[in-house]
């Protein structure tokens, strides 16, 4: 048995025991013994992912985090040590011509737009993003495609062995999950000789492990809001300070229109860093007098992300003295805001095609499968859920209404971490769902599930308790909505976030019923009632709480002319749903 295989078994045994207090060592061994042996000469992809997952519970890393909490700068210093142990220096990253992007809402979509625009120029692109939806290799892309399982496996073990070989008494820990993937992305991009790399910040900016990048070509900040407050601060201004930490001396940076307070913080951070910061004009300004721009991603909020992406791509091409940009006519708007406005220009044909052809699964995505329509959006902050509700309601109003049978509206929701799920659910309440379904971000309740979907940082009891809390919040909101005071209050303004025309409610609805399931698979089986070809033979409903809704709702769903399902609250939840609805994504 190879060293790697032996080390993998030992690490996973420890991870299984430490992550699940009720799991015995014998059970962990039985779980491990069920794995198929890897094909020689190398380790298989799933083995690499299982080993990567052990870094989620790396005990020495957790101890390191406790020590570094009062000194966040030490986190960046530790990342530089890991980079050196892996065989790279910080200066090596300058070869990647990086576009570094942070933000609270839309940073992933902005990166996707930017990468697709530049790829349309024939450039070889690298793209590092998080989290993944179905497979962890989605986080590292070359020319828009996730790296192959073979390439992932090769680079994973090469990096793992390198870090093991060059550890010493003072640096014995392996980097944790996200740090390891960040290092791996840098190695992949350098070895694949990309022309540029689009790098999405993980959390925050100032102390994020991607911020060892010292000389990006350009930086971007998407819309700001409240998220990860325990790490970044409890006000938008504090969060803006963290996000502005990616600014570098002399490196152009762009942001979209923000509230006055956080915009002032970004301006001050830029001035302190000697970073030229520009405010993006709205997309309409770039369309003025020209053809309307078509976006590959749905939702009005994507226009802000597209405007930022155009400026990032334009600046990158300008810095590289690209022929297409030298001939582009631009105008410099007068200063009307706290910041100078970025140039206005008519997008080139390559830019237009890039915006039109952008794909970013799990964000304002619609899947139609027979009578079921799935609306997938990984919104997980108050501002992004507001945008999700607007998109969902607009999509419903454009949808065709069936001639036979009522329409049924279902919410599938989960929220994790320190996010205020009650606040998120309150924003979803006006959509007037018939059923609210809650489940953890687990595709199956089984220890043999795909390694890409495993999370060792929480226990099953913890995630189920969280779902029951979601259900309790929803029930309280439903009771309040049904109260005479609520019914007599003014209706939401048409077109406002959360506004849904009463005519869209099915005639049989008298209120929202809620259910909790132990995994995504059981939730989808109940919602689809065998009417989706993937779930033609559903097992009996497995609601955690006995509820007449399970049986009465099943008959209504079976007879419905159309079933509209909004899946939101967590990108991990959306990823699990996509994994089950589109099995090809796991191949």
Curated annotation (Swiss-Prot):
Binding site for Mg(2+) 1: 130, 200
Keyword terms: ATP-binding, Cytoplasm, Ligase, Magnesium, Membrane, Metal-binding, Mitochondrion, Mitochondrion inner membrane, Nucleotide-binding, One-carbon metabolism, Phosphoprotein, Transit peptide
Modified residues (Phosphoserine): 539
Cofactor(s) this protein cannot do without: a monovalent cation
Keyword Phosphoprotein tagged: yes
Region (Disordered): 484-508
GO biological process: one-carbon metabolic process
UniProt xrefs under InterPro entries: Folylpolyglutamate_synth, Folylpolyglutamate_synth_CS, Folylpolyglutamate_synth_euk, Mur-like_cat_sf, Mur_ligase_C_dom_sf
Assembly description: Monomer.
Protein family according to the UniProt entry: Belongs to the folylpolyglutamate synthase family.
Protein name (database record): Folylpolyglutamate synthase, mitochondrial
Organism: Cricetulus griseus
